[in-house]
Amino acid sequence: SNSRYDIVLFGGINYDTESTELLLKSKKFSNLDFVSQSMSEEDSRGGSSWGYLPGTLQEVTNIEHIAIKKKLKVSMFTGNDAMEEQFKFLNGANSPQIIHISTHGFFFEDIEQGDNYDASKNPLNRAGLLFAGANNSWQGGKQVEGLEDGILTAYEATNLSLQNTELIVLSACETGLGEIRGSEGVFGLQRAFKNAGVEYIIMSLWKVPDAETAEFMEQFYKKLFSGKTIPEAFLFAQNTMKKKYPDEPYKWAAFVLVR
């Protein structure tokens, strides 16, 4: 029966949330023990910052509506509420069947060699997802005591326990990119979430336009919540998009299902 699906959605995230606001919201997570990791000074990217993704709010809102229609249990975190703490809270017994994260993802490819770089030689420190307020520490701002930095690294994800989670969808820019390391294959987030115990991962290998991303996800979830398996629903969404955009594979071919 599909009633067992419960789903947690993150999207429409505010990357500029003030630390004071996050600190207030983080109170409810204060007794939880997370593995935390901060950006090192060298990793922070100085001037650049992450922009709001309006398409992601539409995307998760659509999925929420589909889930509610099917009478599934759904939680959605957007804006300032889409905190890294909130994601880490989905650990262990709180781990839902499906987690859908629609946000910026990143991967640092090459590293200038420097003394402090040992930590960053590990590819798990160089891939991640962005949550509320991430711009502060991304731009080298001061870390606030007792607060996550809004940047979930693959290393932090590896330390979560997501055995109850059948599927994680990373609907984001560049999240599929990893570092090819001999026969070990692709590191990065994919590896991290597998280590955390997730069975299936859907991710994109390049940035797909917002409208088509939302469309793909809608096709996928409608089928999934109607009782199809994850691979069946994924194949259906792919074929539907392929028929609709035969000459524009960039609009759908980026999505991959990893088991």
Model-derived features: positions:
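Catalytic cores of enzymes
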Residues: 1-259
